[in-house]
Amino acid sequence: MLKNYLFRETRTGEEFICQAPDHATAEEILEFEGFDLMYVNIICILSDYEAEQSGLDVY
């Protein structure tokens, strides 16, 4: 099952969503997508509906 993880890049304030298996760690998700772990925080997990309605980029 995939979950929608909402992240925020701390330097720019940009928010984005990564879809990943529910057993994946935040570090695994960000490393796979090529984001710098030092500058990204996980905010929350969104439902499919919330992710769709957010208008944010989904990786």
Predicted features by range, described:
Residues 31-59:
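Short, mixed-charge low-complexity intrinsically disordered segments
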